[in-house]
Amino acid sequence: MAAQKINEGLEHLAKAEKYLKTGFLKWKPDYDSAASEYGKAAVAFKNAKQFEQAKDACLKEAVAHENNRALFHAAKAYEQAGMMLKEMQKLPEAVQLIEKASMMYLENGTPDTAAMALERAGKLIENVDPEKAVQLYQQTANVFENEERLRQAVELLGKASRLLVRGRRFDEAAISIQKEKNIYKEIENYPTCYKKTIAQVLVHLHRNDYVAAERCVRESYSIPGFNGSEDCAALEQLLEGYDQQDQDQVAEVCNSPLFKYMDNDYAKLGLSLVVPGGGVKKKAAAPPQAKPEGTAAPAAEEEEDEYAGGLC
């Protein structure tokens, strides 16, 4: 079966080459027919699991379409070549071709297809190169935002934010989450704004920036329904505990269902949050115990006793 498909692919390649040849009576190559044959060859090689040959056929198809000024079809062929590279586990190269395809989709005036291609590329590379995936998701969000498809845009920004948090790139994560929050506010999804405020505060506290965290909460009072919500109350309690270096209070808030059932990356931020100094709030000192006669008191106690009766 595989051998048959390989032979079939080779036959289509040969036909494509003939369509590209010129002669005395044929002055111009037939790019359209050649592209069609290259496409058929790619399918045959793919079915035979000869992905290298399939990729090469896709690239030749793309060039033929470009020469024929058929940008959309050229982009499709480049995207298919990228998918063949994916099958070969050559993910960075695959993403490069899919990015090229997306730029051609944009040039052709099909931004939706461009955005879908970029998102697909992000998913491919996410586990191998999270930094590249963030870039791709942000590009996708920009495309959707330019098309005023804000719900799709904010979904992709959310993916980028979570990857930034996972990579502990907190400065960038704070900016990304703020963009999400702005869009959710614009589309009047206020409850999600509250959740994004929690995410912001956790990120800022991991940046050791209490002032920025407090400012996020203060600015959120203008969001309808936030003041008086359980999210607001929990954040005020969290900030109070953090400011007073009360690890117990911080842990209690971060272990509450409101925090634990957030997206996993943010829930982990809560569970790993440590107050400045890293300790539990100081407890009141125990009353001094009576010491038997002749027992030497510690130096610190001697210093205290020296002034026990007040200053003369």
UniProtKB/Swiss-Prot annotation:
Cell location: Membrane; Golgi apparatus
Biased composition regions of type Low complexity, renumbered to the chain: 285-299
GO biological process, alphabetically ordered: intracellular protein transport; vesicle-mediated transport
Cross-referenced SUPFAM superfamilies: TPR-like
Hydrolase recorded as keyword: no
Comp. bias regions, Acidic residues: 300-312
Family according to the record: Belongs to the SNAP family.
Protein name: Gamma-soluble NSF attachment protein
